[in-house]
């Protein structure tokens, strides 16, 4: 079956931005103008087509990126029909993972900025991610009808803060309440959209006299930018000082595709102005799948390879998102890089080493779906029937195996305990958490061996709130959520010799075990460089403790280590040497010596200056210079030790060691100190002694 749309006419794009820049509204307008949705869904009514999870409609934010396919032939029907696959991405920092995944499979992006707020913290994160994957992009400065909106100021911020070479291709006519339309700097005409039909039609009129000079200045800058694309264009420009419309398009396109410039458009999606011009920009300036470099991959032997975007190449696709659908079960969203996949075909997953059959293939329009027979290079679609696929896996032809690069996912930074409210919820909870963890690699689930509790970890407090919320709504599981917990430990600080005697004689056979044990701090590490928990040494001479009982003494000490001596936390870093003792021919037994060993530790550890240890985290905070003092002051208040400072393009990097107990609520706190512009990551570094005043509180609360 031949292609319906030639590959050159495909555009796989993402719409990304900071929370509240208006990106979902922009996507809604795109669907309206391209004829897919007949009534525009407003976000503040909770009716937007792309926000299909209940939590999204309630909170008015986008959590998971929905994928949609639509067609566009231009504002003036000047193009052949182009197929645009759109992925709407979340802008909240707790969901950065969704943005990262989307950018990984896109060929181009439209980054939306708010006309009054300009470049906000999450826009810096999104921009960094787009740079990481080399995604060509155009900019839409939205909300030009908002008070304080200023198109040129936002363009200047993008230049200075994001270090991007911005080239405006439009200029706004009026702003705030007086925002009327835009000047097209290529055609040098003003575009006025018709308000009666929600901006479906427009008029081209002359540029207002007061804006003529500024429009001409910006046009010259734009033509210079286009001319730098090639020597021929530059020669022509230097000879005549002008380029034709086609040459301008050609030059701008070449430079956008090379990530040398970023074109800026403006408008107000909510007021139905400017979105169709952005769609024209997507078709004109963003790449088709076969106009980006061939996807890099590896063969099964780890040799570097690549796959061209072609139907004739062997099949290769990346599973970039999993979702559970109430009607069809598991949906696996894939981006096809090469070859053809028909429903019913078998695919090979080299990451898992498994072969699976694709049941059906559907094209998603937000959460509505159309069944299709096949997908080809460049397509984005969802497969039904794959059981063993996780995010980031490759699907390919078993005869021609390649592994597309793995996606890197960040380590979770916050954990809480969850427990089902009733016995009936217990089994449902583990199924629900398993499914949610398969969908979202930045969310982890584990069982705490000490407490037996289920611990969930994620990218932030909002992230975990939404997980608990989804358990309740989608899986009907009610759960209690605990406060974040810290895994403390205990140890000893000095050397001590301890005698312990366990004697029971009450008629018949008694019990007799008698030992002398030396306890001291153990400063040894294992082959992984981790501190050793326990070491037992046998120095018994002359059989005063018979060989068959020595293992029991060690066992008794080790079991008591798990229960601690101060607050019931496991002990680590203890060396025990058995050097003397005595036995009874009839009454001694393994049990008696085991109990004697455990008594020796219990008594000895108290004399050996036992103390409580806490996990210390290695914390890295990236912050703009303006907030450096506040961020460092806050880390000091959290008992942090600043180890050093670095610089990177996003600002200053602070490296510190901070107790985990002081890091709860930090994500929210650092966000408010830096107005959301600082970001942080942390990982476990070591255990260290807790200050006495805090240790006393811990012991008191554990023993009460």
Swiss-Prot record:
CDD domains: EF-G (cd01886), EFG_III (cd16262), EFG_mtEFG1_IV (cd01434), EFG_mtEFG_C (cd03713), EFG_mtEFG_II (cd04088). Signal peptide: none annotated. It holds the Pfam family GTP_EFTU. Residues 8-290 form the tr-type G domain. The keyword Cytoplasm applies. InterPro entries: EFG_II, EFG_III, EFG_III/V, EFG_IV, EFG_V, EFG_V-like, EFTu-like_2, G_TR_CS. It is found in: Cytoplasm. One of its GO terms (biological process) is ribosome disassembly. Its main location: cytoplasm. GTP binds at residues 17-24, 88-92, 142-145. Gene3D superfamilies: 3.30.230.10, 3.30.70.240, Elongation Factor G (Translational Gtpase), domain 3, P-loop containing nucleotide triphosphate hydrolases, Translation factors. GO terms for molecular function: GTP binding; GTPase activity; guanosine tetraphosphate binding; translation elongation factor activity. Keywords: Cytoplasm, Elongation factor, GTP-binding, Nucleotide-binding, Protein biosynthesis. GO terms for cellular component: cytoplasm. Catalyzes the GTP-dependent ribosomal translocation step during translation elongation. During this step, the ribosome changes from the pre-translocational (PRE) to the post-translocational (POST) state as the newly formed A-site-bound peptidyl-tRNA and P-site-bound deacylated tRNA move to the P and E sites, respectively. Catalyzes the coordinated movement of the two tRNA molecules, the mRNA and conformational changes in the ribosome. Belongs to the TRAFAC class translation factor GTPase superfamily. Classic translation factor GTPase family. EF-G/EF-2 subfamily. This is Elongation factor G. It comes from Francisella tularensis subsp. holarctica (strain LVS). The lineage of its organism: Bacteria, Pseudomonadati, Pseudomonadota, Gammaproteobacteria, Thiotrichales. The gene is fusA.
